[in-house]
């Protein structure tokens, strides 16, 4: 299995007649962070529960560091989970919460105290040992939950939507802390979220799931730039989809032609295709050819940019423009496309 540390082979999971995971194959390299991303009900949390040993697969095998753990209990998998709900004991001090797993393993008091101290220092909570859960903030509670997992030094660390209960600013700081610690400690990690920004921020690779299947696995930048289906294109950020034509690297939309230098990376034959345009790929200018002309339908000020809906060739085209490049007085403009943010899909999609 080479450097593959966590491997799922031909995994199927059914509940009654309902198949929620359909012949899934997945491998994670030692020391990497991979995120399962997808809409509600796609199967991502079920995969995490299968890895943890909280569910058993109907078919297939699970390996950790080369060992078949398919039938092993959660206690025998050397795995820790950071939950969305934190799952802290309110009647225990922070130190006792973090050291609870060590105590259950029979680790002596002196060693336990030292390891708890080190774990709290890792999550920037040095000196919090004697406080209680109701004396700290939600963000601090999540860091306590993270310290409780790290103190056990697991082979695999699982994250089950750990930031869902935090506000936007805390989510940002916590995902940075999680990524920093995961890289510093080199812990193989599997992360579950429905939040694209979160997935992009913490991951070496992102796996997008839908209806119990893996749709695409790649680094975040590649997923966004080269989606392999309409589902991926719509799920990984906003885009406008147009009918187009590809001929030797030149793309035609509404009689407007432009060269796409990396067209070969989409592995399409010349001919009809679908062209996806991200909002940031569009520049609205005051001059252009007739086939570039669009009509401004609406514009909403979002703070650092304008979110604009235009009509181009009879279809809506979403545009994000900076305040310097757009005025509310504009009724018409001309579409200029940049190569970054334009992608191609098979017409059959």
From Swiss-Prot:
GO molecular function: ABC-type ferric iron transporter activity; ATP binding; ATP hydrolysis activity
Binding-site positions, ATP: 38-45
Domain ABC transporter: from-to ranges: 6-236
SUPFAM superfamilies (alphabetical): MOP-like (SSF50331), P-loop containing nucleoside triphosphate hydrolases (SSF52540)
Localization annotation: Cell inner membrane
Enzyme superclass (EC): translocase
Superkingdom: Bacteria
InterPro entries linked to this entry: AAA+_ATPase, ABC_SmlMolc_Importer, ABC_transporter-like_ATP-bd, ABC_transporter-like_CS, ABC_transpr_FbpC, Mo/tungstate-bd_C_term_dom, P-loop_NTPase, Transp-assoc_OB_typ2
Keyword Lyase: no
Record-linked Gene3D superfamilies: 2.40.50.100, P-loop containing nucleotide triphosphate hydrolases
Function: Part of the ABC transporter complex FbpABC involved in Fe(3+) ions import. Responsible for energy coupling to the transport system.
Record protein name field: Fe(3+) ions import ATP-binding protein FbpC
Biological source species: Histophilus somni (strain 129Pt) (Haemophilus somnus)
Taxonomic lineage from the root: Bacteria, Pseudomonadati, Pseudomonadota, Gammaproteobacteria, Pasteurellales
């Amino acid at each position: 299995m080479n450097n593959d540390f966590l491997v799922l082979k031909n995994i199927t999971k059914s509940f009654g007649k309902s198949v929620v995971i359909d012949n899934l194959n997945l491998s994670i390299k030692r020391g990497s962070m991979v995120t399962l991303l997808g809409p509600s009900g796609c199967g991502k949390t079920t995969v995490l529960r299968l890895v943890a040993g909280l569910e058993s697969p109907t078919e297939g095998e699970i390996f950790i560091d080369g060992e078949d753990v398919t039938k092993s209990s959660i206690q025998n998998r050397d795995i820790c989970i950071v939950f969305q709900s934190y799952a802290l004991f309110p009647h225990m001090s922070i130190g006792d919460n973090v050291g609870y797993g060590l105590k259950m393993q029979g680790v002596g008091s002196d060693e336990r105290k030292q390891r708890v101290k080190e774990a709290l220092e890792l999550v920037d909570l040095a000196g919090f040992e004697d406080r209680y859960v109701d004396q700290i903030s939600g963000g601090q509670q999540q860091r306590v939950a993270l310290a409780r997992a790290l103190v056990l030094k697991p082979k695999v660390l699982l994250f089950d939507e750990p930031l869902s209960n935090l506000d936007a600013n805390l989510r940002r700081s916590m995902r940075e802390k999680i990524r920093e610690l995961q890289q510093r400690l080199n812990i193989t990690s599997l992360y579950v979220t429905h939040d694209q920004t979160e997935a992009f921020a913490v991951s070496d690779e992102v796996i997008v799931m839908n209806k119990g299947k893996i749709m695409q696995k790649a680094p975040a930048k590649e997923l966004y730039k080269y989606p392999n289906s309409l589902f991926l294109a719509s799920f990984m950020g906003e885009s406008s989809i147009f009918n187009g034509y590809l001929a030797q690297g030149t793309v035609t939309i509404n009689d407007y032609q432009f060269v796409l230098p990396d067209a070969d990376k989409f592995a399409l034959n010349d001919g009809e295709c679908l062209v996806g345009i991200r909002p940031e790929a569009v520049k609205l200018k005051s001059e252009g050819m007739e086939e570039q002309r669009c009509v401004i339908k609406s514009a909403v000020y979002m703070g650092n940019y304008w979110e604009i809906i235009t009509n181009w060739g009879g279809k809506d085209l979403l545009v994000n423009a900076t305040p310097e490049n757009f005025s509310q007085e504009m009724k018409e403009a001309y579409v200029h496309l940049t190569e970054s943010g334009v992608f191609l899909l098979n017409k059959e999609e």
